[in-house]
Amino acid sequence: MNILFVHPNPDLSKTGGDKRGFFHKVIGKMNVLCPPLTFPMLSAVTPRKHKVEMVDECHQKIDFEKNYDLVGITAMTHEIIRAYEIADEFRKRGAKVVIGGPHASALPEEAKQHADSVVIGEAEGIWFKLLEDLENGRLKSFYFQKKPPDLTGLPAPDRNILNRLILVNGVQSSRGCPYRCKYCFVGNSTHGRVFRKRPVEYVTGEIKRVRQKLINFYDTSMTIDTEYTKTLCKALKEEVNKKFIFLGNINTLCKDDELLKLSREAGCIQWNIGFESISQESLREVNKNTNKVKEYYKAVKKIHDHGMFVHGFFMFGFDHDKRTIF
């Protein structure tokens, strides 16, 4: 079969979406610089008898005139209107369409109105079955893997389908998060609550094969199991000569000087941090109980003192937010 994977660009939506564009343009540039691993992972578990292509609309155009047997689309909520437009157009042309990703997983019945099938949650474990069902004319409306994929058994992503111009590549050493922050899709999805790790040697081996010199770790958080991360950092220091971007919890980092030291020695140049708010009341509102606002300054200073940057993520519009939040 001819298979096309599509990552939609919401700015191209004809019927809706945020036309102010700033957020979408930032996300789009991030995808060009450091593309998601969803489709490279699915390509890796696709039998070689099938032909796979990928289009990221942030920097590529979709050829709707080309014949595809299956079109796979993933989308977050801000991308979903454009995703539905793409799905509707391909279905009109006779292609089967599968939609997955955070929005479709949260609202599968809605997504099904625009697709022949919807994948709920992580897809690697059921992708082969889906393709087999499609070939045999038995494609189901919904696919859901009862158990989360075992990361030990998954192959490395097929990066051959990515744009060769990307400057930063992504790697994942773990999945899942045991915390239940109300705003986060990961901790509120069935498989997302199950924290899983890849063997360290799998991670370092994959990084060695990546040509880019800057690697962004796509883990939900690298401070959930700090002993694992420390072991990984030691291996990266010994075996790999590259730079890294990590993501973690600010208060865990504040208390763990050893982790900061080892991450810097491994080549980490930046920690991405979900501060979310400078109001403790707002953090309680969304169950972000791991963050302690009074420790923010101390933690940021510690990271800086170890020679690493801090990239902070914030949200605004909580019920308790006032103008002073800015």
Language-model features: where?
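Acidic, low-complexity intrinsically disordered segments
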Residues: M1-R209
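Conserved strand-to-helix beginnings and helix N-cap segments that scaffold or border functional pockets
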Residues: E65, A83-Y84, E124, T226-K230, ...
